[in-house]
Amino acid sequence: MNIQYTSLFILLFCPFLFLSAQYTDELNSNRPGASQGAFSVGKRVLQFETGLGFGKEKHDLRENETDAFAFDYSIRYGVWKEELEVSLMGEYQSNSITNFKGSSPYEYKESNFRSNTLGVKYLFFDPYRKMVLEGPNVFSWKANNTFQWRDLIPAISFYAGANFDTADNPLTPDPIEDTPLENESSISPKFVLSTQNNWMGGFVFVTNIIVDRITTDSPTYSYILTLTHTPTDWFSIFVENQGIKSDFYADQLFRGGAAVLINENFQVDGSVLLNFKDTPSRLFGRIGVSYRFDMHDSDEYIEDKGRSGRKNKKE
């Protein structure tokens, strides 16, 4: 895929600029998976999501093994509108690598940021707000308790951010290879299209289509599919698949785990990551927490916006 296809991708999806709103009484965390849900945290909500990861990688071609420690973080804040969220997300990783080439193994260490991204997400289509306002169908039990075709229509958001990569970073691709900028710090764009379906029975399905670092010599194209199930009000489990395509790194990753909602503003979680290749093979365990400071005061509804909303207020 090249820059022309990337531009076409953005042009195809940007026109869907509808209005909606979202706020939940309970914490709305992206953890413990890697995907971004379509919904923002809500206006005047400040949320922190962070975790620790411990894992091992083994690369058969390079004949080395890596013991890794990772710290990931996300700071999210709902500002101006219910649909709008600004965030700082990133991950710092420290590797202890043992190389088995030659007659005697030797060990070395490397550490840096795998990512450090400042961005904005906007929820531009939310079919669930209309469903909530309409209320249940008082004439049909079946309509309220069985699958409906409209359940396939997801909420949709768009994220645009900037990656801030440090110089001489072994964990990120060089911005422009074979030039004086090869080992310099760089800023590159990241775009994410997110969809979210909230289905009956406590199932939530999230998809992400990601275009990352397209101005560098190693652009990354990926997708994430996340299925979450909440059997109770306080406990959830998830499975996730992530596909990554890049000259720097390509893989198929699989995650699974659980989260426990301690109270409406605090969540703890744990997850496992693995893949099925040997260049490298990866196995990671992660634990994390999410906490929000809820300063939200009032919801903005679709009916409150535009000409009809102003007319209703005058009446």
Where are the regions a protein language model picked out?
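Bacterial Sec-dependent N-terminal signal peptides
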Residues: 1-27
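Transmembrane beta-barrel domains of Gram-negative outer membranes and organellar outer membranes
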Residues: 22-214, 218-315
